[in-house]
């Protein structure tokens, strides 16, 4: 090949290489622009401080994917790509914050669960954030509400009071989850405002927490899951005191494989003389729980404290239902939900750690938390101490 041909070939190759480089740089720039545009539209949640204890970060990263997979299995949902958003806090209108950290769990780009890290046992409530032991819990708590505005260029504060949970955005306060209290008005917009002190504290935070996917994904594994056969969520408690009625109905329907039981009918059986108007105010006492179970052919007995993981595992295998009895840590005598009852649905091992899966009658989904935690941080920002169990439904 003569020198002119060589030069021509070299020039052609050079032009091709330069063109490819320009195209690749353009693609890289467009990709970065797409990422920047995507992140610019991400929802941001205001926090007083973006500092999170290292043990909280580590626990969240280690546990979130396994928890999400286990909960998906309970609802027969397909698993997907799980990612963890950044931690956020929930505040009262006067600026007080609770002792928990919340993370959005994102599956295939959609917020599906909320991971909550809260004090593990009652003794931890008096410890500092750095010293306390944390329990990890997952549920669908406000996940759908966050997902609805995830891709908006929004900046919100998550607030709570006795009526429920709110999103504050541009000075407007909107109720997103109402508490199960009688005569609770489920107003879409509230006249409440954030206290000036909280506004000032939120302004001092350099970076609000972002609801966006993190790159690092842990390969959490669900080694074992044992579920009470035939358990289904058929109803939900709201403005009544029938938590034990709901729990007993759900457990008996599961262990008898029927749709016969419901909370209203159980409460009507326990209070035959009470009017329909007054029935929602009737609660259930331990002796009634035992007697009703016996009337349905079940040998019910009370057991103090939290049953061991192995006991739950065996009872669940034997198709025997367990009802959780819990008491509010606040001990407020005016609280209509001072005591609460829940149903144990399953147990699991996630990354070799023992977990319990339960149903809170206030919710339409299940929750998972550590099996050795006696403190239940429930969906309405209330801490309950699991003090005993009714076994045998």
From Swiss-Prot:
Q: Which residues form the signal peptide?
A: 1-36
User: Which GO biological process annotations does it have?
Assistant: proteolysis
Q: Which UniProt keywords apply?
A: Hydrolase, Protease, Secreted, Signal, Thiol protease, Virulence, Zymogen
InterPro entries named in the record: Cystatin_sf (IPR046350), Papain-like_cys_pep_sf (IPR038765), Peptidase_C47 (IPR008750), Staphopain_pro (IPR028076), Staphopain_pro_sf (IPR037155)
Gene3D superfamilies per the UniProt record, alphabetical = Cysteine proteinases, Staphopain proregion domain
Provide the activity regulation entry from the record. Answer: Prematurely activated/folded staphopain B is inhibited by staphostatin B (SspC), which is probably required to protect staphylococcal cytoplasmic proteins from degradation by SspB.
The annotated site for Cleavage falls at 219-220
Q: What is its EC number?
A: 3.4.22.-
Q: Name one GO cellular component term.
A: extracellular region
| Broad class of the protein's primary localization | secreted
Q: Does the keyword Protease apply?
A: yes
**Pfam families, per database record:** Peptidase_C47, Staphopain_pro
Which family is this sequence assigned to? Belongs to the peptidase C47 family.
Function in brief: Cysteine protease that plays an important role in the inhibition of host innate immune response. Degrades host elastin, fibrogen, fibronectin and kininogen. Blocks phagocytosis of opsonised S.aureus by neutrophils and monocytes by inducing their death in a proteolytic activity-dependent manner. Decreases surface expression of the 'don't eat me' signal CD31 on neutrophils. Cleaves host galectin-3/LGALS3, thereby inhibiting the neutrophil-activating ability of the lectin.
Identification of the protein by name: Staphopain B
